[in-house]
Protein backbone atom coordinates (compact mmCIF):
# COMPACT_ATOMS: atom_id res chain seq x y z
CA UNK A 1 0.00 0.00 0.00
CA UNK A 2 1.07 3.53 -0.70
CA UNK A 3 0.95 6.66 1.36
CA UNK A 4 -2.48 7.75 2.61
CA UNK A 5 -3.77 10.86 0.86
CA UNK A 6 -6.62 13.08 2.07
CA UNK A 7 -9.16 14.40 -0.41
CA UNK A 8 -12.54 16.08 -0.19
CA UNK A 9 -15.87 14.70 -1.34
CA UNK A 10 -19.01 16.77 -1.88
CA UNK A 11 -22.31 14.98 -1.26
CA UNK A 12 -25.97 15.84 -0.97
CA UNK A 13 -26.87 16.00 2.74
CA UNK A 14 -29.53 13.28 2.42
CA UNK A 15 -27.07 10.96 0.67
CA UNK A 16 -24.46 11.62 3.37
CA UNK A 17 -26.98 10.80 6.12
CA UNK A 18 -27.84 7.51 4.41
CA UNK A 19 -24.14 6.73 4.01
CA UNK A 20 -23.52 7.43 7.73
CA UNK A 21 -26.37 5.08 8.69
CA UNK A 22 -24.93 2.41 6.40
CA UNK A 23 -21.50 2.84 8.02
CA UNK A 24 -23.06 2.48 11.49
CA UNK A 25 -25.07 -0.63 10.54
CA UNK A 26 -22.04 -2.30 9.03
CA UNK A 27 -19.79 -1.34 11.94
CA UNK A 28 -17.31 0.86 10.11
CA UNK A 29 -15.17 2.92 12.48
CA UNK A 30 -15.06 5.79 9.98
CA UNK A 31 -16.40 7.00 6.65
CA UNK A 32 -12.88 6.64 5.26
CA UNK A 33 -12.76 2.91 5.95
CA UNK A 34 -16.18 2.38 4.38
CA UNK A 35 -15.17 4.40 1.33
CA UNK A 36 -11.90 2.43 1.00
CA UNK A 37 -13.88 -0.84 1.01
CA UNK A 38 -16.31 0.46 -1.60
CA UNK A 39 -13.47 1.59 -3.84
CA UNK A 40 -11.75 -1.80 -3.50
CA UNK A 41 -15.00 -3.57 -4.40
CA UNK A 42 -15.48 -1.36 -7.46
CA UNK A 43 -11.89 -2.01 -8.57
CA UNK A 44 -12.31 -5.76 -8.01
CA UNK A 45 -15.51 -5.77 -10.06
CA UNK A 46 -13.76 -3.88 -12.85
CA UNK A 47 -10.86 -6.36 -12.88
CA UNK A 48 -13.27 -9.31 -12.97
CA UNK A 49 -14.88 -7.86 -16.09
CA UNK A 50 -11.61 -8.75 -17.83
CA UNK A 51 -11.55 -12.33 -19.09
CA UNK A 52 -7.78 -12.39 -18.41
CA UNK A 53 -8.00 -11.70 -14.67
CA UNK A 54 -6.91 -14.24 -12.07
CA UNK A 55 -9.63 -15.02 -9.58
CA UNK A 56 -10.65 -17.30 -6.75
CA UNK A 57 -14.14 -18.07 -5.59
CA UNK A 58 -16.73 -20.24 -3.93
CA UNK A 59 -19.51 -22.01 -5.79
CA UNK A 60 -22.39 -23.41 -3.74
CA UNK A 61 -24.91 -25.82 -5.25
CA UNK A 62 -28.06 -27.26 -3.67
CA UNK A 63 -29.57 -30.30 -5.35
CA UNK A 64 -31.65 -33.41 -4.73
CA UNK A 65 -29.26 -36.34 -4.95
CA UNK A 66 -32.16 -38.61 -5.94
CA UNK A 67 -32.50 -36.78 -9.26
CA UNK A 68 -31.56 -39.30 -11.89
CA UNK A 69 -27.98 -39.04 -13.14
CA UNK A 70 -27.44 -35.65 -11.48
CA UNK A 71 -24.63 -36.70 -9.13
CA UNK A 72 -22.82 -38.39 -12.01
CA UNK A 73 -23.21 -35.34 -14.26
CA UNK A 74 -21.89 -33.00 -11.57
CA UNK A 75 -18.85 -35.19 -10.97
CA UNK A 76 -18.14 -35.56 -14.69
CA UNK A 77 -18.29 -31.78 -15.24
CA UNK A 78 -16.01 -31.19 -12.27
CA UNK A 79 -13.47 -33.65 -13.65
CA UNK A 80 -13.54 -31.86 -17.00
CA UNK A 81 -12.17 -28.75 -15.27
CA UNK A 82 -10.27 -30.38 -12.41
CA UNK A 83 -7.39 -27.91 -12.74
CA UNK A 84 -9.69 -25.06 -11.63
CA UNK A 85 -11.22 -26.85 -8.62
CA UNK A 86 -9.05 -26.68 -5.50
CA UNK A 87 -11.40 -28.41 -3.06
CA UNK A 88 -14.97 -29.60 -2.64
CA UNK A 89 -17.17 -30.14 0.39
CA UNK A 90 -20.31 -32.27 0.25
CA UNK A 91 -22.95 -31.83 2.96
CA UNK A 92 -26.19 -33.80 3.41
CA UNK A 93 -28.81 -31.19 4.31
CA UNK A 94 -31.67 -33.66 4.74
CA UNK A 95 -32.82 -37.00 3.30
CA UNK A 96 -32.92 -35.58 -0.21
CA UNK A 97 -30.98 -32.35 -0.52
CA UNK A 98 -27.23 -31.93 -0.67
CA UNK A 99 -25.04 -28.86 -0.55
CA UNK A 100 -21.90 -29.02 -2.66
CA UNK A 101 -19.32 -26.27 -2.06
CA UNK A 102 -16.45 -25.87 -4.51
CA UNK A 103 -13.39 -23.69 -4.03
CA UNK A 104 -12.29 -22.55 -7.47
CA UNK A 105 -9.34 -20.56 -8.79
CA UNK A 106 -7.95 -19.61 -12.16
CA UNK A 107 -8.73 -17.38 -15.08
CA UNK A 108 -11.79 -15.27 -14.23
CA UNK A 109 -13.59 -16.04 -17.47
CA UNK A 110 -12.88 -19.75 -17.18
CA UNK A 111 -14.12 -20.12 -13.61
CA UNK A 112 -17.23 -18.06 -14.39
CA UNK A 113 -17.88 -20.49 -17.26
CA UNK A 114 -17.44 -23.45 -14.88
CA UNK A 115 -19.86 -21.93 -12.36
CA UNK A 116 -22.44 -21.22 -15.06
CA UNK A 117 -22.10 -24.74 -16.45
CA UNK A 118 -22.59 -26.44 -13.06
CA UNK A 119 -25.47 -24.17 -12.00
CA UNK A 120 -27.33 -24.83 -15.25
CA UNK A 121 -27.31 -28.63 -15.01
CA UNK A 122 -30.87 -29.87 -14.85
CA UNK A 123 -31.74 -30.79 -11.28
CA UNK A 124 -29.57 -28.19 -9.54
CA UNK A 125 -32.09 -26.33 -7.38
CA UNK A 126 -29.94 -23.37 -6.48
CA UNK A 127 -26.48 -22.18 -7.36
CA UNK A 128 -24.57 -19.19 -6.02
CA UNK A 129 -21.12 -18.05 -7.08
CA UNK A 130 -18.96 -15.44 -5.44
CA UNK A 131 -15.48 -14.68 -6.66
CA UNK A 132 -12.75 -12.11 -6.18
CA UNK A 133 -9.74 -11.06 -8.18
CA UNK A 134 -6.39 -12.20 -6.83
CA UNK A 135 -4.46 -9.36 -8.46
CA UNK A 136 -2.18 -7.80 -5.85
CA UNK A 137 -2.70 -4.21 -6.96
CA UNK A 138 -6.39 -4.25 -5.94
CA UNK A 139 -5.61 -4.48 -2.25
Curated annotation (Swiss-Prot):
Q: Which domain of life is it from?
A: Bacteria
- What SUPFAM superfamilies does this protein map onto? ACT-like, Ribbon-helix-helix
Report the Pfam families cross-referenced here. Answer: NikR_C, RHH_1
Please give the InterPro entries that the UniProt record associates with this protein: Acetolactate_synth/TF_NikR_C, ACT-like_dom_sf, Arc_rbn_hlx_hlx, CopG, CopG/NikR_regulator, Ni_resp_reg_NikR, Ribbon_hlx_hlx, TF_NikR_Ni-bd_C
Annotated Ni(2+) binding lies at 79, 90, 92, 98
Keywords from UniProt, A to Z, are: DNA-binding, Metal-binding, Nickel, Transcription, Transcription regulation
> What is a biological process (GO) this protein takes part in?
response to nickel cation
Family assignment from sequence similarity: Belongs to the transcriptional regulatory CopG/NikR family.
Quote the protein name from its UniProt record. Answer: Putative nickel-responsive regulator
Q: Provide the species name.
A: Lawsonia intracellularis (strain PHE/MN1-00)
Amino acid sequence: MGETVRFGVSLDEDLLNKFDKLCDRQGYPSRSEALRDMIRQALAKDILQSKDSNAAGVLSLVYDHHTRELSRKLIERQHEMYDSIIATLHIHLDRYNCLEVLIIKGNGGKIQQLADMLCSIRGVKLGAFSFLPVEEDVF
